[in-house]
């Protein structure tokens, strides 16, 4: 974190927080930083965390997440995106030995049109009921809902290639 980033939103009516040094490292997790933040703030009904590295999340995406929490459908909501690869066709390689991870390859189930789709957190937002988060220290449980973000808006900027791709979307 740096002053330049922090000052970029100085004119907005939002509460800003600078992470302590131990949460501003490549090995620090977002979850650890959020749990520390929960300990520092006065409690609210819900807690929402929007990652600046995923800038193309829309207001409608955020509203969908908030609605799920308000309707008491869940304890937490996470922005999700479809994984483009067919995970069931994944293999491990040991030297030159191919080791299928799933049994699809051994059973001949290789047509990706008939294989279940998988999703992952998009990096856009994490929302949860305050008390649930304090007690469980995690956003994922049996009562977690997802808001699916289309791949075009699920750009999680972590590398130079990600920056170039994001720039190509706005220029």
Predicted region positions:
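Cofactor-binding loop segments of dinucleotide-utilizing enzymes, especially the Rossmann-like FAD-
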Residues: 1, 52, 81
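Short phosphate-binding loop-to-helix
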Residues: 3-48, 56-60, 64
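Conserved core of the sugar-phosphate nucleotidyltransferase
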Residues: 27, 32, 55-149
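Catalytic donor-sugar/metal-binding loop of nucleotide-sugar-dependent glycosyltransferases
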Residues: 135-155, 160-171
